[in-house]
């Protein structure tokens, strides 16, 4: 008999008491030697059924283990075999099969990073199970296992995971990524865009230095306008002004964009810089 614990719609379910009875009967009648494997198996069984009892679970349905990733521990990984991201474990007379990809997703989503660390401790590459694990970790702000992966210089299939880091203002982790990996200029540019859109002035200050304003003034002006239009963060706007950009550029385009997008804090700041813009504001609101 197989008990398939996956999220693909094809799983069976079983009554908890029935499953416990089956396992106990098999152990009593067919298991003669109390080996290390048998001891670990019994520990797994005891932990699973203790969890079911604690949470008043009477029927084991699809995904019960994958959806509760704390159940995937060292013993389960030691005794099971992994093939194409699926963990299979024989607990006679049943075989439990767990979708580790779903387990990783739920582990990250619900801030239970223990599973990722266990996989790494067991030299099991989580990237082979979930190729987007870096992005998952950065999106859900699970930085401890992410930093561990970066320090290991783990395989990275796509550096899009740095963009949530920029949006969240995690400059130190971005710098760590750049220490271990070579990021293309295009990626750096997108990091800056995310920082500008989300008001992360610490990241803007790090990448858009005085030298950047001297060597690429048109690009800096583009960032300035985009920041007003799509971000609207006053701290970002002030940074660009402090670096030498002015509101009179391109026939007062910064003022017009701020007026059209109703950036009141920015307009107030611009008015403090130049109170002659009042008519421009009126014409563009």
From Swiss-Prot:
ANK repeats lie at residues 99-129, 157-186, 188-214, 215-249. The keyword Translocase does not apply. InterPro entries: Ankyrin_rpt-contain_sf (IPR036770). Disulfide bonds: none annotated. Keywords: ANK repeat, Repeat. This is Putative ankyrin repeat protein R551.
């Amino acid at each position: 008999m197989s008990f398939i614990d996956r999220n693909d719609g094809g799983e069976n379910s079983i009554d908890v008491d029935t499953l416990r009875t089956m396992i106990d009967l098999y152990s009593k009648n067919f298991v003669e030697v109390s080996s290390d494997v048998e001891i670990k198996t019994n520990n797994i069984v005891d932990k699973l059924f203790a969890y079911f009892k604690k949470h008043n679970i009477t029927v084991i349905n699809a995904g019960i283990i994958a959806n509760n990733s704390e159940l995937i521990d060292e013993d389960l990984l030691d005794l099971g075999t992994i093939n194409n991201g699926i963990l299979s474990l024989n607990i006679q007379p049943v075989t439990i099969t767990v979708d580790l990809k779903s387990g990783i997703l739920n582990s990250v989503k619900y801030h239970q990073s223990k599973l990722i660390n266990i996989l790494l401790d067991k030299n099991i590459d989580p990237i082979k199970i979930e190729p987007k694990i870096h992005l998952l970790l950065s999106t859900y702000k699970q930085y401890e296992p992410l930093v561990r992966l970066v320090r290991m210089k783990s395989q990275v299939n796509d550096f899009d995971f740095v963009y949530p880091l920029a949006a969240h203002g995690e400059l130190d982790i971005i710098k760590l990524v750049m220490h271990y990996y070579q990021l293309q200029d295009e990626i750096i540019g997108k990091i800056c865009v995310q920082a500008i859109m989300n008001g992360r002035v610490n990241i803007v200050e790090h990448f858009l230095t005085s030298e950047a304003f001297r060597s690429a003034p048109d690009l800096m002006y583009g960032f300035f306008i985009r920041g007003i239009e799509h971000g609207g963060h006053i701290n970002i706007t002030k940074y660009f002004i402090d670096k030498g950009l002015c509101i009179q550029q391109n026939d007062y385009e910064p003022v017009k964009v701020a007026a059209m997008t109703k950036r009141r804090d920015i307009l107030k700041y611009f008015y403090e810089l130049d109170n002659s813009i009042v008519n421009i504001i009126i014409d563009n609101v």
